């Protein structure tokens, strides 16, 4: 069993914002796998099979900073192990068009990830970071305004392709594990002209 959890804020006000790219990737997974969401405890939940693996796609409906509050529910219902949970979220330290898989790590200042670490009791869970680019201002207010802003028209074409790449990466995690997925996807980057492969 694998859990693919996209982070974001619920409601129309936040649709299409940089902070909600995790939700967008979760929606892309649901579409790719031909399934639909149902309502779980404080989350939207979809079920699918990838080859012989049961997959649950999860979007917490708690608002970003409380994302981890659904972890006890997932654990009590399905006994989710940290290594089987891929958390998908936005990252200001990566440029738009770049994704990065990691097997573990700190929150990097991301409050949704911080909440998941708290409720899981460990930093040892895989994550898929989606680049949203750095803000012009690095102060806290500037960063908050930035993550709640929408992508420019030029960025939208890139982020659409990036979402598809992230869906591919998440499914590679399900099929092949985190290390193989990292090898296949961490060196790839989407540009505004074409999809390119670059080596680090």
Specify the residue positions occupied by each region the protein language model found.
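Nucleotide and nucleotide-moiety/phosphate-recognizing core
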Residues: 2-104, 113-129, 136-144, 157-200
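Conserved TIR/SEFIR loop-to-helix hotspot centered on a Trp-containing motif
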Residues: 107
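A hydrophobic, small-residue-rich beta->alpha segment in the mid-to-C-terminal subdomain
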Residues: 153-154
């Amino acid at each position: 069993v694998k859990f693919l959890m996209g982070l974001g804020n619920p409601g129309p006000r936040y649709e299409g914002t940089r902070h909600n790219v995790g939700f967008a990737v979760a929606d892309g997974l649901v579409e790719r796998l031909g399934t639909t969401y149902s309502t779980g405890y404080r989350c939207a939940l979809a079920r699918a099979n990838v080859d012989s693996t049961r997959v649950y796609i999860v979007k917490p409906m708690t608002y970003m900073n409380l994302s981890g509050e659904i972890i006890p529910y997932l654990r009590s219902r399905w006994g989710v192990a940290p290594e089987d949970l891929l958390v998908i979220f936005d990252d200001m330290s990566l440029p738009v068009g770049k994704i990065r898989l990691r097997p573990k790590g700190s929150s990097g200042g991301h409050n949704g990830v911080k909440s998941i670490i708290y409720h899981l009791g460990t930093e040892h869970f895989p994550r898929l970071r989606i680049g949203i680019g750095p803000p012009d201002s690095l102060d806290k207010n500037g960063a908050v305004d930035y993550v709640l802003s929408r992508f420019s028209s030029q960025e939208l074409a890139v982020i659409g392709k990036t979402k598809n790449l992230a869906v591919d990466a998440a499914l590679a995690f399900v099929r092949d594990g985190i290390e193989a997925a990292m090898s296949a996807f961490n060196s790839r980057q989407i540009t505004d002209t074409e999809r390119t492969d670059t080596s680090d």
